[in-house]
Amino acid sequence: MEDEIRAFCQTAADCFIRLGDCAPAIAEAAGVVTASLRAGGKVMFCGNGGSAADAQHLAAELEGRYLKERAPLPGMALTTNTSTLTAVGNDYGFDHIFSRQVSAHGRPGDVLVALSTSGNSANVLKAIEAAREKGVSVIGLTGAGGGKMAEVCDLCIRVPSTQTPQIQQMHIAVGHLLCGLVEDALCS
């Protein structure tokens, strides 16, 4: 059992070392988010399962604080309103639970951060489509392959793993990096 624990930790450590290769894309994403917030835009987040939890976590880091005492920043998780999710899911289908919200709330200059370990989640892809129609910039967080999202995002950060647990660990790390870089830019 201890060997399994050590192997898990070593795999995670190796993934995080390789995540450094994503530094240019992460820095670019932080610039996009910072510019949007400076111009009065907002950041919307979406994803399924563990990615939904990450979406909520990262929106909370913006609305509350990450590391610095500052004014709240407009972050919005599209995963939280159960009435909207179930009404849209029932009336239009699960594939539209995020896209309807992007269509309702998205404005030119806003940012959608779309999370999918595979890059192929149908409802996330529909949200990206809606974002593009509204003039919303799209930052994708996926696994190494990128899936269909790699082709449709303005910027796709493909973390260096094909295993869901490691992808999710790195997604939250990327999110924390984004929050920290944005705070540094806006609070300096």
UniProtKB/Swiss-Prot annotation:
SUPFAM superfamilies: SIS domain (SSF53697)
Enzyme class, spelled out: isomerase
A molecular function GO annotation: D-sedoheptulose 7-phosphate isomerase activity
One record GO biological process: carbohydrate metabolic process
Residues that hold substrate according to the record: N48, G49, G50, E61, N90, D91, S116, T117, S118, S121, Q168
InterPro entries: GmhA/DiaA (IPR035461), Phosphoheptose_Isoase (IPR004515), SIS_dom (IPR001347), SIS_dom_sf (IPR046348), SIS_GmhA/DiaA_subfam (IPR050099)
Cellular compartments per GO CC: cytoplasm
Necessary cofactors: Zn(2+)
Keyword Isomerase: yes
Note on cofactor: Binds 1 zinc ion per subunit.
Keyword terms: Carbohydrate metabolism, Cytoplasm, Isomerase, Metal-binding, Zinc
Pathway: Carbohydrate biosynthesis; D-glycero-D-manno-heptose 7-phosphate biosynthesis; D-glycero-alpha-D-manno-heptose 7-phosphate and D-glycero-beta-D-manno-heptose 7-phosphate from sedoheptulose 7-phosphate: step 1/1
Chain ranges of the SIS domain: 33-188
Miscellaneous comment: The reaction produces a racemic mixture of D-glycero-alpha-D-manno-heptose 7-phosphate and D-glycero-beta-D-manno-heptose 7-phosphate.
Name the record gives this protein: Phosphoheptose isomerase
Record organism: Rhodospirillum rubrum (strain ATCC 11170 / ATH 1.1.1 / DSM 467 / LMG 4362 / NCIMB 8255 / S1)
Lineage: Bacteria, Pseudomonadati, Pseudomonadota, Alphaproteobacteria, Rhodospirillales
